[in-house]
C-alpha cells in the first residue's frame, strides 16, 4: 500500500481480518517511512521531512500501533521491519557529492536512528510471538548501524546511502528488489499458514497424553 502509514495499514488490517474465519488467516504488514515523515513542498514538490520537534510522538505512535496489532492478532500477524526506501530525493541522492540543505543532516541521522530502534522492537515482538522476522530493510541499506556510527565519528560527511542497484531513479525500487520482497513475503506467509493449521501428528498427541497422565 504505497503512501499509507503504518496506522492506516493497521486500521485496514483490523477491519479486514475479522471478516474472515478465525482459522484461516495470516497477515503480513509492511510500511515504509511515510509512517514517520511528512510531505512538504519546501525545496521540492515531493520531498519528505522528519521534524525533530515531533520525533518522540511519532515513534511513540508507531510503537503503540505495533503493540496493539500484536495484542489483537497475536501470531497471526507478522510485522515487517520498516524499509526506508524513500530516504527519498531530499534525504539521499545518487550522487554523494550533492550537499545536503542546512539542518537536514540532523533530520537524516535522527530518522535512521529511529528506524533502527523501531525495527529492533518489531523484531523482538515477532520473536516473542513466534513469528519469523522479514528483514526487508536489511536489503536496502548499504551500511550497518555500527558502520554508520563509526563513519560519522571519522567524518561529518553524509555516509548513509541505499544500495543503488535496488533503485531505478534514486527513488523507486527496481524490478529485482520488488521480486525479492514479494517472494520473501509470500513464501513466509505460506510456510506460516502450514505451520499454524497443520494438525499435530498422532505421535505428538500420544506423547502429550502420556505426559499429562504422568503429571497426574
Region spans (language model):
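Conserved SGNH/GDSL esterase-like catalytic core that processes O-acyl groups on lipids
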Residues: 1-64
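Structural beta-sheet core signal
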Residues: 29, 78-81
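Short catalytic/ligand-binding loop motif for oxyanion handling, primarily in non-cytosolic enzymes
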Residues: 35-39, 85-91, 141-145
